From Swiss-Prot:
GO terms for cellular component: cytoplasm. It comes from the Bacteria. This is Holo-[acyl-carrier-protein] synthase. It comes from Chlamydia abortus (strain DSM 27085 / S26/3). Its main location: cytoplasm. Its EC number is 2.7.8.7. Belongs to the P-Pant transferase superfamily. AcpS family. GO terms for molecular function: holo-[acyl-carrier-protein] synthase activity; magnesium ion binding. GO terms for biological process: fatty acid biosynthetic process. It catalyses: apo-[ACP] + CoA = holo-[ACP] + adenosine 3',5'-bisphosphate + H(+).
């Protein structure tokens, strides 16, 4: 496998907290899949994990070279913690159209920021 592209993103957790407070479930349903919501909302403070996934989706979209839009939407990028590290799930059509075989992702957060780095492989 070879690296096709990389993508990074950083976001203030307070932005996600404010968006959830203002738009509540509508915002969650627009950005996050049901599985992502179930995982994050079980936490005492879900905002850091939601922000990390938001940054992850942005980083993945950048690594795919598409951004969020016509080819890849917010919920097309699903970030789940299957083992100890997050895994990226995309619709098969995205892999085929872009010639990508896999996307690796690292996400992290501190008290104020969430960050992510994605590597798209061909």
């Amino acid at each position: 496998m070879q690296i096709a592209h990389i993508g990074t993103d950083i976001i203030e957790i307070s932005r996600i907290r404010k968006a959830i407070k203002t738009h509540n479930q509508r915002m969650l349903n627009k950005i996050f899949t049901k599985k992502e919501q179930v995982y994050c909302l079980r936490l005492i403070d879900p905002c850091p994990s939601l922000a990390a996934r938001f940054a992850g989706k942005e980083a993945v979209a950048k690594a795919l070279g598409t951004g969020i839009g016509k080819i890849v939407g917010w919920k097309d990028i699903e970030i789940l913690k299957i083992s100890k590290q997050p895994e990226v799930f995309l619709p098969e059509r995205v892999y085929q159209k872009l010639g990508i075989s896999k996307v690796l992702l690292s996400i992290s957060h501190s008290r104020e920021y969430a960050t992510a780095m994605a590597i798209a492989l061909i």
